[in-house]
Amino acid sequence: LLIATTEDGMELGLYLDASVLERLGRRCPLVALDESNLGDYCTALEGVSHFHYVTWSTGCDRRVSLLELELQAEVDKYASALSLLLAQREGRFPGELFQRLFEGCRLLPHLTAAERERYREAHRCAARFCERLETRYLRRRQARPAALLAELRSFYRLGSHAKLRHALQFV
C-alpha cells in the first residue's frame, strides 16, 4: 500500500505483483481455495485489507497504527479464507485453516527488528482472537455464523488500543 499526503488530503495506491495476480488467474481461489493458491490469495488480500482499512479509518477521521493495520489484515485473511472454504465445502468446517495461517509462519529476512516485532505481535494477537472465534462460533455442535460475522464487524470498528485489548482478552 502506497500512501502520499497531499495538501488536499491523501492519495492511496495498491500495488499487487503481476506474478501473484497471474497465478491467482490460473488457480482462482473463488473457485477452489487450497494449498496451491492460499499464499497468493493471502498476499493479495493483505494489500486489499490495508487499502480498505486506511480508507475506512480516514472516513471516520481516525488515525491507524501500523500494528493495528497488520492485526486487522491477519484477521481479514482468516475471515475471508474461512468464508470461502465454508462455501466451497458446503458448510464443512476447514479445521486446517487456523494451522495453515497461524502456525509455523516465517518472516522475511530483510525486515528490521521493529518490523519483525510488529508483525509478530499482530500475528500473535490475531491468532489468539481467531482461535477463540473458532471455539466460540464454529467448533461447537451448533455453529453460529451470524454471531461470528457480528463479532468480526464489531472488531473491525474498534480503535487501535481497544482492538489489541479485545484480541487478547476475547473470551
Indicate residue ranges for each PLM-predicted region.
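Long, hydrophobic, amphipathic alpha-helical segments used as structural scaffolds
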Residues: 56, 81-88, 134-137
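Acyl-donor binding region in acyl/amide transferases
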Residues: 37-40, 44, 59, 65, ...
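Auxiliary, metal-adjacent structural segments of Zn-dependent hydrolase domains
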Residues: 1-25, 34-37, 84-86
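Pan-zinc metallopeptidase signature
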Residues: 109-171
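Post-HExxH zinc-binding segment in Zn-dependent metallohydrolases
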Residues: 63-102
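Active-site recognition of the HExxH zinc-binding catalytic motif
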Residues: 41-55
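Short helix/strand-bridging catalytic loops that position acidic/His residues to coordinate divalent metals
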Residues: 30-33, 55-68
